[in-house]
Amino acid sequence: SCDLLPSDKPTFRHYMGDVFDFIDGDWDLAIFHPPCTDLAISGAAHFKEKIKDGRQQRAIEFVERLYNCDIPRICIENPVGVLSTKSKLGKPTQYVQPYEYGHYETKKTGLWLRGLDPLKPTDIKDLTGLPKKVTQRLHYLPPSPDRWKIRSTTYKGIAQAMAEQWG
């Protein structure tokens, strides 16, 4: 893994720093989870400000640079937002939902793929009759210092499917 933040779990396989300082290597696959703060539709109320001060454009250019790096197989993961309409990436190759991978929740997430087959669902859950507080848990999280981190966590079932199908 690579992030500007330290890993939540002790590991010797975590590079803390700028991904572009580390990306030039002998990689055959990269699964990128770029920050969605300035891109996701959940922050649409703040888009005007983010466009005006350049944050949104910088975020788009960061993602485009990741996608165009010299790695043969790439996945860019990001929730529904402006990448599909304002970036050179266009629409995602596919959208995935946590309930397709063993979780009783919804969070429509785009995958922009290069050199990879679309991810196949592994364990589709029926959400019929479940309350929104369960299926849309992330929307109901109370304010907290870690709310952003909880909302951005990759679902284990999706990560496992990526590892098994692409790894």
What spans do the regions from the language model cover?
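Conserved active-site and SAM-binding loop architecture
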Residues: S1-G167
